[in-house]
Curated annotation (Swiss-Prot):
Molecular function GO terms recorded: calcium ion binding; protein disulfide isomerase activity
Known function: Protein disulfide isomerase. Promotes the localization of acetylcholine receptors (AChRs) to the plasma membrane.
Lineage: Eukaryota, Metazoa, Chordata, Craniata, Vertebrata
Family matches, as SUPFAM superfamilies: Growth factor receptor domain
Signal sequence extent: 1-29
Cytoplasmic compartment residues: 384
Stated name of the protein: Protein disulfide isomerase CRELD1
Gene behind the chain: CRELD1
Topological domains annotated Extracellular: 30-362, 406-420
Family: Belongs to the CRELD family.
Originating species: Bos taurus (Bovine)
Compartments, record wording: Membrane
């Protein structure tokens, strides 16, 4: 393969890179993508560049391992010295840098391939860290560790120890982000250098801070014990350095509905529904009612269900009363069913006969078929010379002939033939 010429950074390439990468002096242009039904967050270009460099370095290790591994050491050293910085090796590495489905990696590689070639053939010795040279210095997609934003400003707490080591600096290592510290649980402040709400300083020196949890209801404290509270969380009151639960149900802080009652809980309260028997209540059950609901009556200290069925409340004939909780309903007595608003006798249907669902005409046809079979049997016996059966046969034929010649027979036969 003929060696590729190192052409440097062509102006056309710079314009292409500016669309994706944002060189100094050029405007960062974000290519808009039509909104999709499920939003997809693309990785920051710095992360794509870091992934490309990591894959490139793995490719360097793979190509050395696959091509050399035992045999004549002198021969390998000679060949390795020629292969190590060759274009052949570079092509082998670049072919495996991006996975087939990683579109961002392929796009970045296409736009920066000449830069990678320039580093490979000319810059390796003076800039051995490809990530620093390509992603930070050349493409300006990334920032050094502990810095963020277009100008690579130090994160709160300093670049050496961003966020004091107790949080994450948003955008750290990239040309984006706000630099805001997202502190770990228990830590707070601009650079996570203070203990957060509900925590106290268990240990502190020039470079080290340990924040431990206060006793449960304490918002601020001087130590872990119950008596170390300096400020209480909502729902608690400070009393002699201890946080005591406030009974909101005994104050105007509780706000429950007319048909609810208040139950105090630690640091708060709950509103629960009154019993069905109550119109307003002071607690759970029918014995804590302020007033009884319709359908209930005061019996001693409780609101109990009124049995309306003790009086004649169902005037309908064949009706009977059924008491329900707080009310009643009228139902039909046994052996009756409701039909059009009244209770009627529930007639038990008789057992259906074998021919009960057949029409009259269908029965007539069935009769004709039956008599036809009888006549055939008689004809068979008459053919044997039996005079008695011969006489019966002649009479049956005469009777059937008269029927079939009748008007009714014509109508039945016509309906049977036509399927009516």
């Amino acid at each position: 393969m003929a060696p590729r010429s190192s052409r440097g950074i062509a102006p056309a390439m710079l314009c292409g890179l500016s669309l994706f990468l944002g060189f100094p002096g050029l405007v960062w242009v974000q290519i808009s993508v039509p909104p999709q039904s499920s939003p997809h967050t693309e990785p920051h270009p710095c992360h794509t560049c870091r992934g490309l460099v990591d894959s490139f370095n793995k490719g360097l290790e793979r190509t050395i391992r696959d091509n050399f591994g035992g045999g004549n050491t002198a021969w390998e050293e000679e060949k390795l010295s020629k292969y190590k910085d060759s274009e052949t090796r570079l092509v082998e590495v670049l072919e495996g840098v991006c996975s087939k489905s990683d579109f961002e990696c392929h796009r970045l590689l296409e736009l920066s391939e000449e830069l990678v070639e320039s580093w490979w053939f000319h810059k390796q010795q003076e800039a051995p860290d490809l990530f620093q040279w390509l992603c930070s210095d050349s493409l300006k997609l990334c920032c050094p560790s502990g810095t963020f934003g277009p100008s690579c400003l130090p994160c709160p707490g300093g670049a050496e120890r961003p966020c004091g080591g107790y949080g994450h600096c948003e955008g750290e290592g990239t040309r984006g982000g706000s630099g805001h510290c997202d502190c770990q649980a228990g830590y707070g402040g601009e650079a996570c250098g203070q203990c957060g709400l509900g925590y106290f300083e268990a240990e502190r020196n020039a470079s080290h801070l340990v924040c431990s949890a206060c006793f449960g209801p304490c918002a601020r404290c001087s130590g872990p014990e119950e008596s170390h509270c300096l400020q209480c969380k909502k729902g608690w009151a400070l009393h002699h350095l201890k946080c005591v639960d406030i009974d909101e149900c005994g104050t105007e802080r509780a706000s429950c509905g007319a048909d609810q009652f208040c139950v105090n809980t630690e640091g708060s309260y709950e509103c629960r529904d009154c019993a069905k028997a109550c119109l307003g209540c002071m607690g759970a059950g029918p014995g804590r009612c302020k007033k009884c609901s319709p359908g209930y009556q005061q019996v001693g200290s409780k609101c109990l269900d009124v049995d309306e069925c003790e009086t004649a409340v169902c005037p309908g004939e064949n009706q009977q009363c059924e008491n329900t909780e707080g009310s009643y309903r009228c139902i039909c007595a046994d052996g009756y069913k409701q039909m059009e608003g009244i209770c009627v006798k529930d007639q038990i249907p008789e057992s259906a006969g074998f021919f009960s669902e057949m029409t009259e005409d269908e029965l007539v046809v069935l009769q004709q078929m039956f008599f036809g079979v009888i006549i055939c049997a008689l004809a068979t016996l008459a053919a044997k010379g039996d005079l008695v059966f011969t006489a019966i046969f002649i009479g049956a034929v005469a009777a059937m002939t008269g029927y079939w010649l009748s008007e009714r027979s014509d109508r039945v036969l016509e309906g049977f033939i036509k399927g009516r």
